[in-house]
Amino acid sequence: MSSGGLLLLLGLLTLCAELTPVSSRKRHPDCDKPPDTKICQTVVRAFYYKPSAKRCVQFRYGGCNGNGNHFKSDHLCRCECLEYS
């Protein structure tokens, strides 16, 4: 990916939290699902939202496409799963 593409991605990620009104943000339903730790392909570091801890936690994702509660970064996890209401 070019440096311009990376800057655009960073800008979009930053806007994720900034443009959504705090009072209307709801956690995505997939964020309540447990992490899928089955191994199907290469194991990579990922993050999932842990509702009991109210935070994102690192885990080993095996590439099985399990559910929507797996993210490439802690930032993306927090952006999608933290609830502001």
UniProtKB/Swiss-Prot annotation:
GO molecular function annotations of the record: potassium channel regulator activity; serine-type endopeptidase inhibitor activity; toxin activity
Record-annotated disulphide pairs: C31-C81, C40-C64, C56-C77
UniProt xrefs under Gene3D superfamilies: Pancreatic trypsin inhibitor Kunitz domain
Lineage of origin: Eukaryota, Metazoa, Chordata, Craniata, Vertebrata
A GO term from the CC aspect: extracellular space
Coiled coil: none
Signal peptide positions on this chain: 1-24
Alphabetized InterPro entries for the sequence: Kunitz_BPTI, Kunitz_BPTI_sf, Prtase_inh_Kunz-CS, TFPI/VKTCI-like
One Pfam short name: Kunitz_BPTI
Function per UniProt: Beta-bungarotoxins are presynaptic neurotoxins of the venom. The B chain is homologous to venom basic protease inhibitors but has no protease inhibitor activity and blocks voltage-gated potassium channels (Kv).
BPTI/Kunitz inhibitor domain sequence ranges: 31-81
Protein name, per record: Kunitz-type serine protease inhibitor homolog beta-bungarotoxin B4 chain
Subunit structure and binding partners: Heterodimer; disulfide-linked. The A chains have phospholipase A2 activity and the B chains show homology with the basic protease inhibitors.
